[in-house]
Design a protein with these regions (language model features):
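Non-catalytic, conserved peripheral segments adjacent to functional cores
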Residues: 1-55, 72, 77, 81-134
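Short beta-strand His + acidic residue motifs that chelate non-heme Fe in jelly-roll/DSBH
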Residues: 57, 65-70
Length: 134
């Protein structure tokens, strides 16, 4: 659960896929493809998911993902494997190269997400390449 104005992300995984669904509230989703050499490398997509449109979002490995709570939000998410803290990676939510449209003004951002590096500064061993090997 997140209160209106909260911003989570951008996170990404080299091995894990996520699936998000919002039964209550409105979340503004921002996805950015970090997979170097892939057909959609560098593309950013922004859209809302909510209890009204009933959209679910599949997020493959190598795609940075985050959301802002447009309203108070309840989000359910599934992952395709066991939790691995070494696969919890991040990139700056406000990176101008990514250019996400977060909708909220004056977002509430966790300390962890405030310190994520810019895309250009991602360490070599933490950069996803196409094709992904899980």
């Amino acid at each position: 659960n997140k209160q209106a104005g909260a911003l989570v992300g951008l996170h990404y995984h080299l091995h894990q896929a996520d699936y998000w669904y919002v039964p209550i509230g409105i979340a503004r989703v921002v996805l950015h493809d970090l997979r170097v050499g892939g057909p959609t490398d560098g593309n950013t997509a922004c859209f809302n998911i909510s209890g009204e449109n009933h959209w679910g979002v599949y997020i493959p490995p190598g795609v940075a993902h985050g959301f802002s709570a447009v309203t108070d939000v309840v989000m359910t998410y599934l992952v395709d494997g066991y939790y691995n803290p070494a696969d919890e990676l991040g990139v700056a939510w406000n990176d101008t190269e990514i250019g996400g449209d977060w909708v909220v003004t004056d977002p509430i951002v966790s300390e962890r997400d405030q310190t994520n590096p810019l895309r250009v500064d991602l360490p070599e061993g933490r950069r996803p390449y196409w094709p992904m090997r899980t």
